[in-house]
Amino acid sequence: MAASTASHRPIKGILKNKTSAASPPVVPSAEQPRPIVEEELSKKSQKWDEMNILATYHPADKDYGLMKIDEPNTPYHNMIGDDEDAYSDSEGNEVMTPDILAKKLAAAEGSEPKYRTREQESSGEEDNDLSPEEREKKRQFEMKRKLHYNEGLNIKLARQLISKDLHDDDEDEEMAETADGDSMNVEESSQGSTTSDHLQHKSQSS
């Protein structure tokens, strides 16, 4: 009998239920009137005004921490200058051969880079504001900087001079050897002629 009474009683939880302490014992749902159930549901649940939520939390102008960049794209400028054709690669679909490349390099070698000419133009304007000591320091600095940046050119020139000197030395040695060889040939021929003269004198005298 204890088993049958235990099956009809609801299982009690550890936590106290506020409604169970104040309300009368639980009556099966068939005996309860309907309005009480709706009343309990309205107390426990909330009604959401979805249009109000959309208007409040999702306005059209809200960016949610994301930035919109309204800048135009950075423009790309081709090289601007007088000798654009010397540096441009837009001569049709012309194939770059070593001869053409050598001609272009030779044409570009004599001209000074554009950034250096711009630096020189701008430095002339700045010199007017400096004292004589500062001008002298700046002049020395620029001179040292030019020497440093032109060091590669100086190395090329030094190599050319060294190779030219070596080539000249080789030619001098060859000329000295040929001169020595010629003098030896002259001596041999003169010795040969003297011996032939002696032989002729001997043959005539005998």
Swiss-Prot record:
Annotated region (Required for binding PPP1CC catalytic center, displacing metal ions and inhibition of PPP1CC catalytic activity), positions in chain: 148-151
Organism: Mus musculus (Mouse)
Biased composition range(s): Basic and acidic residues: 111-121, 132-143
Segments of this protein annotated with the region Disordered: 1-36, 75-143, 164-206
Its job: Inhibitor of protein-phosphatase 1.
Keyword field contains Glycosyltransferase: no
Record carries keyword Nucleotide-binding: no
Superkingdom: Eukaryota
Name the UniProt record assigns to this protein: Protein phosphatase inhibitor 2
InterPro entries, sorted: PPI-2
